Amino acid sequence: MAASRRTAEGNGIRYGVFTAIPMIVYTIVAALAGFLGKIEAGSLNVVIIITGVVLAIRNLRTVKGHHLGYLQGFGTGIITGLVASVLLGATFWLLGGIDQAAVAQVKARDLFGSDLGILISGLGIILVGTMTSVITSLIAMQYYRTPDESQSEVEDVD
């Protein structure tokens, strides 16, 4: 009964936390192993966000009995990516506060000072994760939207 009343926002927060957990574990492992500075290492986090967004939209559609409005699915996908990205960014800031050497791998140039470099990097993580979730939600909702919901068409009014 409670599952049928699940909201898009609650589903997004729930799946955002579920998505953040493997991203945080992977980031900590990458920092400890010394390959956090490789650009390719960050691409796995993008794949994890894409997977989390699609699973969140799919779950909400299943819970709603395959009657999912476009904006509900779009919203749950964005919230999923935003929550996961904020948690990953906070983990990055915490990691930077605990172990400067681990985060130093990421800095190409220290243009704004060491503290601001960590701050900007965390904000960049949030921005990239959120924009990835927006694009993924747009694409996924073309597949998961309700079948009777047609594309908006321009109608001639005579």
Task: Describe the function of each predicted region.
Residues 1-63:
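Transmembrane alpha-helical insertion/packing segments
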Residues 13-17, 75, 79, 119:
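Internal alpha-helical transmembrane segments of multi-pass membrane proteins, especially GPCRs
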Residues 26, 30-34, 57-61, 88-96, ...:
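Membrane-water interface at transmembrane helix exits
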Residues 61-80:
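Alpha-helical transmembrane segments with an aromatic anchor "belt"
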Residues 76-94:
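Hydrophobic alpha-helical membrane-insertion segments
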Residues 101-119:
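Short, membrane-exposed interhelical loops at transmembrane-helix boundaries
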Residues 115-136:
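Hydrophobic alpha-helical transmembrane segments
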Residues 147-158:
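Short, highly charged, low-complexity non-transmembrane loops/tails of multi-pass membrane proteins
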